[in-house]
C-alpha cells in the first residue's frame, strides 16, 4: 500500500513539475528567460491570428525543450521561428517575421497617422494596433481640441468650439453665404483642421525627439499633415485614411 502511494506521489510530482527554464542571450549579451507570451505577442505583431501565433509559439517551444540546451542565443530562436513559420504558413509569413524583427532591432520609432470620418472605427483600430505592436503612446485629436477649447474662449475662436463637420457655421459671414453646401462643409473642416495642426505637429515632433512610437488618430488627421514632419528623421511614418465604403442596411 505504501509503495502504491509513493508511486502515485512520484507521478503527481512529475506531472506538476515546471518545465526547465531556457535562458536566451541577446545581441547585447544580456541573458533573460525565454518567454512564450512575449514570443506569441511578437508573432501577433507580424500579422498572425491569435490561433496561428499560439500554434507557432508552441512548436518553437517544443523544439527548444527537445534540444535540451539550458542557454541559447536569440539568433537561434529567430532561426527556429523562421523555419517554423515557413513550414506552417508559407514563405511570405516567414519573410514578414524577418522584416518585423529587423525593424524592432533598428530602434526606429513608428508614427501611425489614422484619419477618417466620425464612426469609421479610428479609435477601435488605434487601440487594437497599439496592443498588437506594443505602442504605449496614443493621442486623439479630439482631446487636443478640448485642451485648445479650454485655452481659447468661444468668442475669440468660435470655429474651434463646433464639431469638425459643423465648423462651417462659424465661418465669416462673407463665406457662409456660399451656395455650394459641400464646399462650405469642406471649408469649415479645413479651417478647424488647420488650427489643430499646431498641437498635432507638437505631439509628433516630441515623439520623434524622444524616439518613441506614436499613434495619432482623429478626424483632423489629414494627408497634408505629412508636410509638417521633417523627412530627415529616420522614423517609419505611415499615414492611413479609414473609410466605410459600404454601409450596412
Predicted regions and their residues:
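Glycine-rich phosphate-binding P-loop
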Residues: 111-133
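Residue-level preference for the first positions of well-ordered beta-strands
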Residues: 109-113, 213-215
Amino acid at each position: 500500500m505504501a509503495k502504491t502511494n509513493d508511486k502515485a506521489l512520484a507521478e503527481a510530482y512529475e506531472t506538476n513539475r515546471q518545465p526547465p527554464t531556457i535562458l536566451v542571450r541577446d545581441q547585447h549579451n544580456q541573458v533573460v528567460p525565454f518567454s512564450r507570451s512575449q514570443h506569441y505577442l511578437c508573432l501577433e505583431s507580424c500579422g498572425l491570428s491569435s490561433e496561428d501565433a499560439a500554434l507557432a509559439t508552441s512548436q518553437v517551444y517544443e523544439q527548444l525543450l527537445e534540444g535540451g540546451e539550458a542557454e541559447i542565443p536569440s539568433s537561434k530562436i529567430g532561426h527556429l521561428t523562421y523555419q517554423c513559420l515557413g513550414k506552417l504558413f508559407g514563405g511570405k509569413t516567414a519573410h514578414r517575421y524577418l522584416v518585423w524583427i529587423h525593424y524592432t532591432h533598428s530602434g526606429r520609432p513608428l508614427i501611425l497617422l489614422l484619419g477618417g470620418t466620425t464612426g469609421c472605427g479610428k479609435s477601435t483600430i488605434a487601440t487594437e494596433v497599439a496592443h498588437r505592436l506594443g505602442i504605449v503612446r496614443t493621442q486623439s485629436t479630439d482631446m487636443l481640441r478640448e485642451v485648445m477649447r479650454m485655452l481659447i474662449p468661444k468668442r475669440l475662436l468660435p470655429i474651434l468650439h463646433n464639431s469638425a463637420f459643423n465648423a462651417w457655421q462659424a465661418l465669416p459671414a462673407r463665406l457662409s453665404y456660399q451656395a455650394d453646401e459641400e464646399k462650405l462643409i469642406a471649408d469649415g473642416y479645413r479651417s478647424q483642421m488647420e488650427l489643430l495642426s499646431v498641437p498635432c505637429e507638437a505631439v509628433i515632433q516630441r515623439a520623434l525627439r524622444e524616439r518613441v512610437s506614436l499613434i495619432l488618430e482623429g478626424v483632423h488627421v489629414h494627408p497634408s499633415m505629412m508636410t509638417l514632419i521633417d523627412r530627415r528623421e529616420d522614423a517609419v511614418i505611415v499615414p492611413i485614411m479609414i473609410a466605410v465604403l459600404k454601409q450596412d442596411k
